[in-house]
């Protein structure tokens, strides 16, 4: 069974990963040396725990975004995804078909849509494409 990591170890490892992401890798020994260089860790045992959690976080980061860690690379990727504009809008449809009740509601609310077409639908009629 695994051991529970303390809040101190997790917090220290997250801060080191955020600041020195470019220097770190998936190798525990290398991460241990980097942690020793960049942080004042009081004991050897604590340094090893921090380095172990850094290695664990680096593996998780490679799989995808990790909660609680803000990396410049991930921020840029998120910004790029949010700023994406599709070539063809899904909202631009040639004709919007509505029944008479819906058309009356839109008129009451003073909403005018350019491609609106009022259709008469039978309540008992079942459309083929709704299956």
From Swiss-Prot:
One of its GO terms (molecular function) is structural constituent of ribosome. NCBIfam families: PRK01151.1. It comes from Theileria annulata. InterPro entries: Ribosomal_eS17 (IPR001210), Ribosomal_eS17_CS (IPR018273), Ribosomal_eS17_sf (IPR036401). Keywords: Ribonucleoprotein, Ribosomal protein. GO terms for biological process: translation. Pfam families: Ribosomal_S17e. Coiled coil: none annotated. GO terms for cellular component: cytosol; ribonucleoprotein complex; ribosome. The keyword Ribosomal protein applies. It comes from the Eukaryota. The lineage of its organism: Eukaryota, Sar, Alveolata, Apicomplexa, Aconoidasida. Belongs to the eukaryotic ribosomal protein eS17 family. This is Small ribosomal subunit protein eS17. The keyword Transferase does not apply. The gene is RPS17. Disulfide bonds: none annotated.
